Amino acid sequence: MVKLAKAGKNQGDPKKMAPPPKEVEEDSEDEEMSEDEEDDSSGEEVVIPQKKGKKAAATSAKKVVVSPTKKVAVATPAKKAAVTPGKKAAATPAKKTVTPAKAVATPGKKGATPGKALVATPGKKGAAIPAKGAKNGKNAKKEDSDEEEEDDSEEDDEDDEDEDEDEDEIEPAVMKAAAAAPASEDEDDEDDEDDEDEDDDDEEDDSEEEAMETTPAKGKKAAKVVPVKAKNVAEDEDEEEDDEDEDDDDDEDDEDEDDDDEDEEEEEEEEEPVKEAPGKRKKEMAKQKAAPEAKKQKVEGTEPTTAFNLFVGNLNFNKSAPELKTGISDVFAKNDLAVVDVRIGMTRKFGYVDFESAEDLEKALELTGLKVFGNEIKLEKPKGKDSKKERDARTLLAKNLPYKVTQDELKEVFEDAAEIRLVSKDGKSKGIAYIEFKTEADAEKTFEEKQGTEIDGRSISLYYTGEKGQNQDYRGGKNSTWSGESKTLVLSNLSYSATEETLQEVFEKATFIKVPQNQNGKSKGYAFIEFASFEDAKEALNSCNKREIEGRAIRLELQGPRGSPNARSQPSKTLFVKGLSEDTTEETLKESFDGSVRARIVTDRETGSSKGFGFVDFNSEEDAKAAKEAMEDGEIDGNKVTLDWAKPKGEGGFGGRGGGRGGFGGRGGGRGGRGGFGGRGRGGFGGRGGFRGGRGGGGDHKPQGKKTKFE
């Protein structure tokens, strides 16, 4: 407890204390003796001895000092004083340090020392209140009135409980009052050795306490001193006291600060920064959102000065805007082109140049290789809001390009192209490119002349983009509608190792070849072969169908129109069979159809298990029709199967009408059906409803794989 009394030793002068009230005059002799001792020992200390002896007075006074230093009403040091005789009444004057002159030095009735409250002047009213008291006089007045009422109730020194409750009520005011009182907080220690130690400590803290030596007057100036003093006292007492009450007071101070004016808050922050409450931050953020900054302009300057504008890209952004303007103007001036204005973008990576006439603009577009500050600039017409439709009309999409082709190689083929953009993914070419021309007429001319041109052994296909491309036949080159003469073949049963290059060697007249791949970059087992005319497609169908490619006999058929409801109803030489049992083999499938020449079951490449569907080939469409009629509603290995004409990607893939009716597994899905336990015939062991769960049932078995969709 010795270290706690050092905080305000050098603050205060006995001459400045208020005249004592009537209660103090009764013990005037004792007070005069204490004043003489104070003048002899240290001109700044005020020690009032107790009647029982100098040492006892110092002890009781020391206990009293701790109370105002630690918020007074925290009910910690003041209550400790009640343990020893003669100190019980000391808590009362310690509390009354926050009252006006009336209670400045009210001693206890039992003769205890008045707790060195003599220095508290009327001007202390402003300093004895927390930060909010300095800002708002109403709070100070309210607390003063409460203190006066408490003085009357505290005349009975034996009622300790009432005193503690009253102290808790005015706790915020008392805490700051004790912090601001100049010399009333310092007393001698219990013995002379403690006094010497305290003097040494006070010399170290003189620099910190100089700001508190003058008694603060009413107003905001007192509030500036409060946070510093309170902070120093709190730091000294953290070692011995519990700070829970102090934290509560700090929270109350923060809430009060939120309600004060911003100007008053700024004054306090100049003296001691105070932690902002969360509510205050939210208010500031709301103000910032309410007044957002104006959006930055993308281009410095105003609207174009003329209608003849030129976009300039790839500028050296390390240069300032004025330097770029001067450099661009000089470059065009060297080419006898007068520049009206130059507007630089905010990023300084691009800009716009305004010319006087369309002739100057056209001449500028013809310039190439111009450099500004070491960067070769890019010149083109600005892209307006309505220019996308125009660009699409003069842009072609080239497919089936070699993956290693470069822009320079394409430039040799498309000499009239204004811009060539190769499409790539993850740094790898996708075999397609966009070819943009200066005019729509150039695009149409190239479309007719370059369709099917070979590049590195691959025949390229050209397509329109935009609205023209929507009316164009899928993979069909020119605009057309379905007339029953498709130019595209669908190739199935393709080896997974086959590539587009392999198919190009087989189908030499093909203009476009696509082998769909999965996410791992592997073939899905089918392909699309496009030709320049229906005759070429028909010829390839007759000559290459069932040819072996890398160990597998391929199947070819003409592609019907996409989305046609009757596409699957067209007969062919191949039947599509779904609803197969997991145990059905290709031999069993082939034997189930009279006249069949080949059968294949689609399996999962990872697990090798059947996907529940397959294909059966015949020598002619007539044989296929007969087999289809014979096996309609038939069963294979106990499963009822569904038959249809083989057709790649239609309105719902192989999953029936829109993928409904159970997908691959018959009506309602799964493996059910009427089939029995075994055999090919109808009925079998289980009769209708069968062993595995009847119509639509999947029983206890897992579904038969994923639906395969063609692209």
UniProtKB/Swiss-Prot annotation:
Sequence repeats lie at residues 58-65, 75-82, 83-90, 91-98, 99-104, 105-112, 120-127, 128-135. Some glutamate residues are glycylated by TTLL8. This modification occurs exclusively on glutamate residues and results in a glycine chain on the gamma-carboxyl group. Residues 56-107, 122-137 have a biased composition (Low complexity). It is found in: Nucleus, Nucleolus; Cytoplasm. Pfam families: RRM_1. Residues 651-697 have a biased composition (Gly residues). Residues 274-301, 698-711 have a biased composition (Basic and acidic residues). The modification Omega-N-methylarginine is found at R695. Residues 24-43, 145-171, 184-212, 235-273 have a biased composition (Acidic residues). The modification Asymmetric dimethylarginine is found at R657, R661, R667, R671, R674, R680, R682, R688, R692, R695. SUPFAM superfamilies: RNA-binding domain, RBD (SSF54928). The modification Phosphothreonine is found at T69, T76, T84, T92, T99, T106, T113, T121, T215, T302, T368, T406. Identified in a IGF2BP1-dependent mRNP granule complex containing untranslated mRNAs. Component of the SWAP complex that consists of NPM1, NCL/nucleolin, PARP1 and SWAP70. Component of a complex which is at least composed of HTATSF1/Tat-SF1, the P-TEFb complex components CDK9 and CCNT1, RNA polymerase II, SUPT5H, and NCL/nucleolin. Interacts with AICDA. Interacts with APTX. Interacts with C1QBP. Interacts with ERBB4. Interacts (via C-terminus) with FMR1 isoform 6 (via N-terminus). Interacts with GZF1; this interaction is important for nucleolar localization of GZF1. Interacts with NSUN2. This is Nucleolin. The gene is NCL.
